[in-house]
Amino acid sequence: MAGIRSIDRSKIMTVSEVARHLLNTCKSLVLYESYMFGSSLSGIGCDYDILIIGPSGDALQKLKDEFKLAGAELPLDILYMLPIEAEETLFVKEQKCVPLLLLAKQ
């Protein structure tokens, strides 16, 4: 019979720590707008929702590779959008996305 495992909260990174970690390790992020959204901003949830807005192509593939390394031990859920998609859906406003740069300064 499987039991419920307790979570060691001392090992969980804050949203600010996650933002700093991603900005420091994913150098290609300078080419994109990057945000966090979702329940982790409220201190609940079990993953970090990240929104990346920018061009597709080789730069995006490089960023995805950087995310694989940077997020190897993090529960990241990453959404990629072209700028026109973000504008048309008003995703940033509707989901109350917060820039990673702002979170990293907290």
Language-model features: locations:
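Catalytic core of pol beta-like nucleotidyltransferases
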Residues: 1-46, 53-106
